[in-house]
Design a protein with these regions (language model features):
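Carbohydrate-active catalytic/glycan-binding domains of CAZyme proteins
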Residues: 1-187
């Protein structure tokens, strides 16, 4: 594994730059912050921002002259544009799914129904959590290593293949799943 101990931000890449009207140039990119020594990135991919500048010969470079993603950068001279925080709780009493939700590799609207039973999110099961194709996982990104999570469940499994519950999901091979299921031996 590649790890540079000189930077808290690792795996930087997949970015886009913007030239602002005030002359500033910024780059937003994906990154991760691994926990040492395991180098596990519990919070997954995050978005970072870097102050950039164009060189005289037309190359884009980091304004600080380095090549490592910086955890902290100088502020823009643009006026503040406050962003409303995402709600920490959802009763699913809207007909629209909030922007804080996503699903691995598929559109959550392909398996989530908010209209059939107001106040609930009805998920139509598809493939297992290990699937790379159509796992019905309605996800919300953790933004802190300390969190309290919970869910309410109304589910009656009819087969050993039916499960529903709460999942802490990193990827299709790394997750913790607390679920209700049908046991053929326990009935």
């Amino acid at each position: 594994r590649y790890f540079n101990p000189e930077s808290k931000l690792q795996k930087s890449g997949h970015g886009s730059y913007v030239d602002l009207p005030n002359g500033e140039t910024w780059l937003v990119h994906l990154t991760s912050r691994p926990f040492v020594p395991e180098l596990r990135c519990t919070l997954g991919r995050e978005t970072a921002i870097q102050r950039m500048e164009w060189t005289e010969d037309g190359w884009l470079r980091m304004k600080d002259g380095g090549n490592l993603a910086q955890e902290f950068v100088e502020e823009s001279s643009l006026p503040e544009a406050p962003v409303r925080p995402l709600p920490s709780h959802d009763d699913f009493d809207s007909e629209e799914l909030g922007i804080q939700y996503y699903a691995p590799r598929i559109d959550p609207l392909s398996f989530v129904d908010l209209k059939a039973r107001p106040g609930w999110a009805r998920l139509r099961g598809q493939e297992s959590g290990c699937s790379l194709n159509k796992a019905s996982i309605l996800a919300r990104k953790l933004t802190s290593v300390q969190a309290t999570v919970g869910t309410k469940l109304d589910f009656t499994p009819l087969s050993y293949q039916h499960t529903a519950g709460l999942i802490l999901y990193y990827d299709n091979m790394n997750f913790v799943y607390l679920y209700k299921y049908f046991s053929e031996t326990l009935n």
